[in-house]
Amino acid sequence: MRVLAFEDSYDITAILAEGGVDLSGIELRQHWNTMDCFERIREFTPDVLLLDHYIPPTKGLDVLHGLLELIATGQIDRPGLILGISSSDEANDAMEYAGADASIVKFKLGEHEVWQ
């Protein structure tokens, strides 16, 4: 499984490992900012895209809006799962409302069913 994460504060590999996720078979790439985010998504073609709501310089919510436009016009392939990750329930709700498949508090990321 190919996982692309945009998260600026916490190491996603560490969060998943602490959550008991078996990382074998997972190719995880984390970016600590959203610069060139669409090119990174296009090049990596993730199965799972993790988007932090408050990441700079472009917030994850704005990245999601732009990504969905590019998908709609056929300019980029849609990841199998787009998952909003934030420490704020309100931010996660906003990500789902905008078109993310699901969202989760980032510290509970290891509990999500995608890792089963």
For every predicted segment, state its role.
Residues M1-I12, L16-G20:
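Conserved acidic segment of CheY-like receiver
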Residues V21-R29:
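A generic structural motif
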Residues D47-I71:
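Conserved phosphotransfer microenvironments
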Residues D62, G84-K108, H112:
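Alpha4 helix (beta4-alpha4-beta5 surface) of REC/receiver domains from two-component response regulators
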